[in-house]
């Protein structure tokens, strides 16, 4: 946002983007960003990301067989859609005309705006109490503390280089297996991650942008390195990630990205397995592997469209002290909650015949 708009950013503005290559996920994930002002001074930015149910792809909700980004919906770079608290009607018209689920989409977007407004209001209340200078000093100290603690945690581990690889059955279009490879090097206070050896971009829609790949690796890092500590702007300073240009995890236009998360469970497991060489007491074995969600959607021409994206659950690997847990959501979709069968049948024209652990 700052790169595109520079000083042309005002109190009350809201910017919106979903470009899969900029933010790393897929076109359904829209990030709303708003500047946070206090007494006329820009003191930060608030952001809220939400998965929009339908963005005009070839299929309702999430296209199944895409082979390029243009089949997956419309793509938006950082764009101002609210200016000085005034919604720009042309943009809102464009947003609602390009979705089959207008009410749900507009409701999600306005909830994102409300979240940013709430954050700005509460930050203002904090600054009323402590002042801007104290706030900035506290942020710097918190970030510095996180960096020091991360460096100490890595320095306490045994130096070494650890390699793992695994395979996804296919990319959803061809029958060719997809390779996932990772090398983790611990060198003093630094943790280096290299994805060289992973598959090049594939025809199917399981490619992923570099930004979200790094986010996934940070998640795996955090499960092993001081998970009890909060994540701040100083976290992950010891972690360096190298992703080859020609790689499934460094998607470029026109690579399809709809199901970008398909390989993420495996990649996280492989990184944890690498780190287990240096800290076996914290590691768990791999958890179940699948595409993580089941999608049902209304047929074309339905009077009222509907969409269900239900997270799957499965078994997690055991640790040195305990067996693995059963029926947990995948690590990547940890924010999902399973929907009770009664609610599911009420909301959607779907009958649940059995809900059980196999």
Where are the regions a protein language model picked out?
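Glycine/proline-enriched, intrinsically flexible loops and inter-domain linkers
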Residues: 1-358
């Amino acid at each position: 946002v700052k790169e595109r708009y520079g000083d042309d950013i005002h109190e009350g503005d809201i910017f919106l983007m979903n470009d899969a290559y900029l933010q790393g996920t897929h076109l359904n994930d829209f990030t709303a960003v708003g500047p946070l002002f206090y007494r006329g001074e820009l003191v930060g930015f608030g952001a809220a990301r939400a998965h929009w149910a339908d963005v005009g792809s070839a299929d309702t909700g999430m296209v199944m067989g895409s082979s390029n980004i243009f089949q997956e919906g419309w793509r938006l770079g950082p764009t101002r859609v609210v200016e000085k608290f005034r919604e720009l009607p042309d943009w809102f018209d464009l947003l609602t005309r390009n979705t089959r689920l207008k009410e749900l989409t507009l409701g999600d977007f306005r909830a994102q705006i409300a979240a940013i407004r709430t954050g700005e209001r509460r930050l203002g209340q904090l600054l009323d109490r402590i002042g801007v200078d104290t706030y900035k000093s506290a942020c710097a100290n918190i970030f510095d503390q996180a960096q020091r603690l991360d460096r100490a945690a890595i320095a306490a581990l045994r130096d070494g280089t650890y390699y793992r690889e695994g395979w996804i059955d296919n990319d959803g279009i061809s029958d060719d297996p997809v390779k996932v490879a990772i090398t983790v090097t611990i060198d003093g206070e630094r943790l280096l991650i290299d994805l060289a050896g992973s598959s090049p971009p594939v025809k199917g829609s399981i490619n992923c942008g570099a930004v979200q790949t790094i986010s996934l690796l940070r998640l795996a890092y955090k499960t092993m390195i001081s998970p009890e500590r909060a994540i701040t702007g100083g976290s992950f300073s010891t972690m360096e990630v190298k992703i080859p240009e020609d790689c499934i995890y460094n998607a470029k236009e026109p690579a399809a990205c709809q199901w970008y998360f398909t390989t993420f469970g495996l990649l996280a497991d492989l990184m944890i397995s690498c780190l287990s060489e240096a800290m076996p007491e914290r590691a768990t074995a791999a958890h179940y592997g699948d595409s993580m969600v089941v999608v049902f959607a209304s047929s074309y021409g339905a009077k009222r469209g509907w969409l269900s994206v239900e997270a799957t659950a499965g078994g997690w690997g055991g640790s040195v002290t305990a067996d693995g847990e059963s029926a947990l959501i995948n690590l990547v979709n940890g924010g999902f909650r399973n929907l009770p069968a009664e609610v599911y049948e009420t909301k959607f024209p779907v009958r649940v015949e059995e809900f059980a652990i196999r």
